[in-house]
């Protein structure tokens, strides 16, 4: 996708650690001429995603927006999200629990997703919505899942293209007595040895 056809928005969380790998990747995109912006999840994620999608529609002439969360770590094949065909393209990644997101059931992973302008123009606002229980204490459906449902109902089929890492804070330890180690379906990569962090 040509730089003038894509707006890139990095979504940061207050107090998040610096992510040098993502900063380097975004700087490289900016040097190529892509419009790279910052947004902050200073309140509900669905509201911030809607705000930035609205800004994109109102302030940009680009054909698509790439939404990328500040805790994503670009890999060798992450750039596929920039050029893969389709109006709704995303990178596969794991959730904060370390499991790959089953996008057909849970909604597309919005940590790194390219969305064409025409998707927003065809869907009714709000595009991203948390569904909650009656007490508004429990999220019953995240903004990624509700957005995916709307897209599929409007005839847009999400397409995976490439992978992206998810920077997770965690403590690794062996299982306790009488417990078995859990099975995980993701790769480990020591990023500082590759010069990424």
Features from the language model and the residues they span:
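Short beta-strand-to-loop acidic/aromatic patch adjacent to the donor-nucleotide binding site
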Residues: 61-73
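N-proximal low-complexity "stem/linker" segments adjacent to membrane-targeting elements
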Residues: 1-40
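A short, glycine-/small-residue-rich helix N-cap motif at loop->alpha-helix starts
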Residues: 43-48, 140-141
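C-terminal catalytic/acceptor-binding lobe
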Residues: 129-197
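Active-site nucleotide-sugar/metal-binding loop of Leloir-type enzymes
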Residues: 50-64
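Conserved catalytic core of nucleotide-sugar-dependent glycosyltransferases
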Residues: 53, 72-135
């Amino acid at each position: 996708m040509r730089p003038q056809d894509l707006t890139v928005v990095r979504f940061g969380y207050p107090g998040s650690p610096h992510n040098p790998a993502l900063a380097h990747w975004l700087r490289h995109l900016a040097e190529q001429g892509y419009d790279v912006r910052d947004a902050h999840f200073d309140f509900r994620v669905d509201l911030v995603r809607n705000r930035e999608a609205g800004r994109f529609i109102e302030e940009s002439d680009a054909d698509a927006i790439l939404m990328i969360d500040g805790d994503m770590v670009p890999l060798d094949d992450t750039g596929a999200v920039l050029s893969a065909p389709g109006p709704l393209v995303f990178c596969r990644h794991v959730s904060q629990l370390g499991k790959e997101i089953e996008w057909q059931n849970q909604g597309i992973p919005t940590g790194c997703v390219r969305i064409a302008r025409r998707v927003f123009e065809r869907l009714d606002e709000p595009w991203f919505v948390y569904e909650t229980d009656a007490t508004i204490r429990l999220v019953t459906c995240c903004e990624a899942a509700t957005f995916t449902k709307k897209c599929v109902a409007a005839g847009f089929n999400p397409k995976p293209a490439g992978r992206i890492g998810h920077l997770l804070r965690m403590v690794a330890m062996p299982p306790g007595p009488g417990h078995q180690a859990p099975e995980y379906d993701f790769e480990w990569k020591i990023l500082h040895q590759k010069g990424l962090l």
